Amino acid sequence: MNGILISLEGPDGAGKTTVLQEILPEIQKMKREVVPTREPGGVRVAEEIRQIILDPKNTEIDSKTELMLFAAARRLHMQEKMLPALRAGKVVIVDRFIDSSVAYQGYGRDLGVEVVDWLNYFATDGLKPDLTLYFDIDTDVALERIMKNRADEVNRLDLERAEMHRKVREGYLEIVAKEPGRFVKIDASQSLEKVVADTLEVLKKRFVSEF
Ligand SMILES: Nc1ncnc2c1ncn2[C@@H]1O[C@H](COP(=O)(O)OP(=O)(O)OP(=O)(O)O)[C@@H](O)[C@H]1O
Ligand SMILES: Cc1cn([C@H]2C[C@H](O)[C@@H](COP(=O)(O)O)O2)c(=O)[nH]c1=O
C-alpha cells in the first residue's frame, strides 16, 4: 500500500475535530489527495453503529459489547473506505482509530490492553497509522470545554464519570510512551491557533516531500 495513514487521538474535548477542520485547507495542498474521515463511522453502516454506541439512552450496552461494536464499525470503515484510498496512494486522516479502543475500552473500561490489541488486530489485519497525533489535555479542562461549548451534544461516552476520563488520559500517555516513533504529542490546552500551528508544523516536517 503506498498511501499515508494519519490518525488523530486524544481525550473527549481535546479539540481533534476542530483542529482537523482548521488544518484541512492547508493539508489539501498536499501533492496527494486527502481523505478526511472519522471513527466510529466514516461509512454508512459504521455511522449507524455510531448512533447506537453513542446514544445516551442505550445504557444496556456493557463494556464488552461496546468494544465489539467499535471493532465492527472499524472493520467496515477500513474495508470500504480506508483501504481503497490507501491502495490508491491517498492520504487518509482519521479522527480516532485503534488507539481509542485501547485508551477507552482497554484502560477506561478496564478490559485490559491485551484483549483490545488482539481485537484491533483481528478487525484491521494489523493496519497501523504511519503517524498518530496525540492531543493531550488535562481531564477537567477537557470536560469543561465540552460542557461549556457543546452541552447540547453530549454523548453516552461524554457522560461517563470523570474517573473514567482520567483513566483514558493515563492510558493514552502510556500508549504514547510505548511507541515514540509513531506518536507525536501536541499540547491541546493551548489556544486553538497555537494547536493548529503546532499540528501543521509536525505534518509539514514529517511529510516534507509531500507538500
Ligand atoms: N484550543 C482550544 N481552546 C479552547 N476551546 C477549544 C479548543 N479546541 C477546541 N475547543 C472547543 O472545545 C470543544 C471540543 O472540541 P472538539 O469537539 O473539537 O474536541 P474533540 O477532541 O473532537 O472531542 P470529542 O472526541 O469529544 O468529539 C469545542 O466546542 C471546541 O470549539
Ligand atoms: C473509535 C472509538 C471511540 N471511542 C469513543 C471516544 C468518544 O468518546 C466517542 C466518539 O465520539 P467523537 O465525538 O467522535 O470523539 O467514542 C471509544 O471509546 N472507542 C473507540 O474505539
Swiss-Prot record:
Protein's GO biological process: dTDP biosynthetic process; dTTP biosynthetic process; dUDP biosynthetic process
Residues that hold ATP according to the record: G10, P11, D12, G13, A14, G15, K16, T17
Keyword S-adenosyl-L-methionine: no
A GO MF term: dTMP kinase activity
Enzyme Commission numbers on file: 2.7.4.9
Keywords annotated in UniProt: ATP-binding, Kinase, Nucleotide biosynthesis, Nucleotide-binding, Transferase
Reactions catalysed according to its record: dTMP + ATP = dTDP + ADP
SUPFAM superfamilies associated with the record: P-loop containing nucleoside triphosphate hydrolases
GO cellular component annotations of the record: cytosol
PROSITE patterns in alphabetical order: THYMIDYLATE_KINASE
InterPro entries: P-loop_NTPase, Thymidylate_kin-like_dom, Thymidylate_kin_CS, Thymidylate_kinase
CDD domains for the chain: TMPK
Role, per record: Phosphorylation of dTMP to form dTDP in both de novo and salvage pathways of dTTP synthesis.
HAMAP family: Thymidylate_kinase
Similarity section: Belongs to the thymidylate kinase family.
PANTHER family named among the record's database cross-references: THYMIDYLATE KINASE, UMP-CMP KINASE 2, MITOCHONDRIAL
Protein name per Swiss-Prot or TrEMBL: Thymidylate kinase
Organism in which the protein naturally occurs: Lactococcus lactis subsp. cremoris (strain MG1363)
Lineage: Bacteria, Bacillati, Bacillota, Bacilli, Lactobacillales
